[in-house]
Amino acid sequence: VYKRQAYGGLQNDGIMLAVYYDVDAAKIIHQLDSWEKINDSPTISSILKNVSSYFGLDFVIPEIASGNFFLYDNSQHKELRSEAEMNTLLLHSEDVNFSLVVWDDEKHTIYIVEYRI
């Protein structure tokens, strides 16, 4: 397990990244059926690339060729499935507050990103 947090400010703003390696796919397979495919979302790929630069980490989330994701807008209390909804949250919202969980099929790895500004 890899975990890094950078929180601060009056409202506990910031970002958290957790990575879980060698996850038993059989334990989460029932969840993945309702998640979106990662290769259909350039927005999710962009978020994952920018997480490492936010922290200034040597650790870089690799490009995920095959997997699934679940993106939840914590401010609106709803799951975001379309690129239009994701772009509205990231580009046009005053309160960016989301949880992102990504499953990498090839590496059996889960990436969790919590972001609040």
Q: Could you describe each region identified by the protein language model?
A:
Residues 1-2:
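Short, small-residue-biased leader/transition segments that mark boundaries at the very start
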